[in-house]
From Swiss-Prot:
SUPFAM superfamilies reported in the protein's UniProt record: S-adenosylmethionine decarboxylase (SSF56276)
Positions of modified residues (Pyruvic acid (Ser)): S63
GO BP, one annotated term: spermidine biosynthetic process
Family membership: Belongs to the prokaryotic AdoMetDC family. Type 1 subfamily.
Protein name: S-adenosylmethionine decarboxylase proenzyme
Site (Cleavage (non-hydrolytic)): E62, S63
Top-level taxon: Bacteria
GO cellular-component term (any): cytosol
Pfam families, per database record: AdoMet_dc (PF02675)
């Protein structure tokens, strides 16, 4: 099935809480994950909550990477949404799993913007759809 985007939603469990509460570490890890996925970084925003926790997003030309952390539980919710067929979202997630020391990861994958459901002829598409199996 052809789609415009590929989204992976991941739950990271048993992470190193000190990394999840460090806004600079989280920012650097997310930017490196975007680079490892071959994304073109446009901008980023991250916020450290008091007393702990970080939320942030890296906006990339191909869509986004987002994270919300709960260091007190060793947990992070990660979202990688990419468009096109040269981006490697799995590479981003594998890097983040290692960076945060996740002991367990649960993922759910979705195809976003299913071309067949749009009723738009392939030759009229402005974005090259990812070929998601």
């Amino acid at each position: 099935m052809r789609s415009l985007g590929h989204q992976i939603v991941a739950d990271f469990y048993h992470c190193d809480g000190s990394t999840l509460s460090d806004v600079d570490f989280v920012t650097d890890a997310m930017l490196e994950a975007a680079r490892r996925a071959n994304c073109t970084i446009v901008t980023q925003t991250f916020h450290h909550f008091s007393p702990y926790g970080v939320s942030g997003a890296v906006i990339v030309a191909e869509s986004h990477l987002a994270i919300h952390t709960w260091p007190e539980y060793g947990y992070a919710a990660v979202d990688v949404f990419t468009c096109g067929d040269i981006i490697q979202p799995e590479d981003a997630l594998n890097y983040l799993k290692e960076a945060f020391g996740a002991g367990q990861v649960s993922t759910m994958e979705m195809k976003r913007g299913q071309v067949d459901m749009m009723g738009v002829p392939a030759h009229e598409l402005r974005v090259k759809p990812a070929l998601c199996a």
